[in-house]
Amino acid sequence: MNQVAVVIGGGQTLGAFLCHGLAAEGYRVAVVDIQSDKAANVAQEINAEYGESMAYGFGADATSEQSVLALSRGVDEIFGRVDLLVYSAGIAKAAFISDFQLGDFDRSLQVNLVGYFLCAREFSRLMIRDGIQGRIIQINSKSGKVGSKHNSGYSAAKFGGVGLTQSLALDLAEYGITVHSLMLGNLLKSPMFQSLLPQYATKLGIKPDQVEQYYIDKVPLKRGCDYQDVLNMLLFYASPKASYCTGQSINVTGGQVMF
């Protein structure tokens, strides 16, 4: 396989797991993270396991147009093509609406939505230039389908991501490029979720060590979403088997969201 995947937010947590999983399937991987040292470390791990030149680390700020333009040029110079873009960058801040700071709201929109737009715009250019019927996949959340209490900034951005995905799918269909959002359930063991335990405990009026079980009880399949669940869906929608699907918001929620 000579296919190249670009993973935004690939230097840590879920993004790093997806980079390793894509490399295991034969993709060459551009590991992109705002923390360039983390991107370089993941790329080094992949090269050590799967062979030299399988991965390269890039430092980039997805919310900066100039940074994304430079990233696109860098990926093009090193890999010469792009077949798959995965937008896995994201942040969340929980607060009651009257306490929610404008700066936090705006930052959520920038990272969760504007960065997705910039990366999709620039990397779809490369796909179109080379006649590649590529794939663009946004890592979204069930909060992009159902409002989330005390998470107005995050949920607003994720709802916006669904609209952007559908619009991109319509724009790019004539080039055979498909676009999807994966709507994840709670990644209970992820650093992002774990960092929010105290805020969620306060919101729910329970102890921090009770938060995970509270969310598990809401899921029909009675467990949280795992990184492997996300990778499984990503690999399918990136594959030729899903070539007739585009513009979809795919639930990976254990049945918690069914529309």
UniProtKB/Swiss-Prot annotation:
Catalytic activity, per the record? D-sorbitol 6-phosphate + NAD(+) = beta-D-fructose 6-phosphate + NADH + H(+)
Give its E.C. classification number: 1.1.1.140
Q: Which EC main class describes this enzyme?
A: oxidoreductase
Q: What positions constitute the catalytic site?
A: Y154
| Binding annotation for NAD(+) | 4-33
Q: Where is substrate annotated to bind?
A: S141
Pathway connected to this protein: Carbohydrate metabolism; D-sorbitol degradation; D-fructose 6-phosphate from D-sorbitol 6-phosphate: step 1/1
Annotated GO biological processes are: protein homotetramerization; sorbitol catabolic process
**Alphabetized UniProt keyword annotations:** NAD, Oxidoreductase
Q: List the disulfide bonds.
A: none
**Pfam family example for this protein?**
adh_short
Q: Carries keyword NAD?
A: yes
SUPFAM superfamilies xref list:
NAD(P)-binding Rossmann-fold domains
An example Gene Ontology molecular-function term? oxidoreductase activity, acting on the CH-OH group of donors, NAD or NADP as acceptor
Report the InterPro entries cross-referenced here: NAD(P)-bd_dom_sf, Sc_DH/Rdtase_CS, SDR_fam
The record's GO CC annotations read: protein-containing complex
Q: What family does the Swiss-Prot or TrEMBL record give for this protein?
A: Belongs to the short-chain dehydrogenases/reductases (SDR) family.
Q: How does it assemble?
A: Homotetramer.
NCBIfam families assigned:
PRK12384.1
What is the protein name given in its UniProt record?
Answer: Sorbitol-6-phosphate 2-dehydrogenase
What organism is listed for this UniProt entry?
Escherichia coli (strain K12)
Q: What is the lineage of its organism?
A: Bacteria, Pseudomonadati, Pseudomonadota, Gammaproteobacteria, Enterobacterales
